[in-house]
């Protein structure tokens, strides 16, 4: 699967901080490491990652959270290394 640079950076960030399975973070926090003019592209990349089943969405009372899919971690590691 071919992903854009935003999606790869999001996967790297989530993997580095250990947001896998039960540990999740807000979608808004994923945007913080990107410039303000690119944050719309980050939201689009998150949607692509959810459709690809690489990120698991979690609805909370205080917004949308997400974590890496632990069943896809081997594929995620390969994508990050490229």
Each language-model region and where it sits:
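Short alpha-helical segments that sit at the start of domains
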Residues: 1-20, 80-82
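Short acidic, hydrophobic short linear motifs in intrinsically disordered regions
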Residues: 20-33
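Short, amphipathic alpha-helical interaction segments positioned at domain boundaries
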Residues: 71-82
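A short, conserved structural fragment
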Residues: 50-60
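Short amphipathic alpha-helical interaction segments
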Residues: 35-51
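Alpha-helix N-cap and coil->helix boundary residues
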Residues: 5, 22-25, 41-44
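Minor-groove-contacting beta-hairpin "wing" of winged helix-turn-helix DNA-binding domains
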Residues: 62-69
């Amino acid at each position: 699967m071919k992903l854009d640079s935003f999606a790869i950076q999001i996967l790297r960030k989530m993997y580095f901080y250990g947001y896998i399975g039960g540990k999740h973070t807000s979608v808004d926090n994923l945007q913080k490491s990107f410039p303000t003019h690119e944050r719309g592209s980050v939201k689009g990349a998150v949607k692509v990652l959810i459709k690809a089943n690489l990120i698991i969405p979690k609805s909370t009372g205080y917004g949308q959270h997400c974590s890496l899919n632990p069943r896809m971690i081997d594929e995620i590691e390969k994508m990050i290394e490229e």
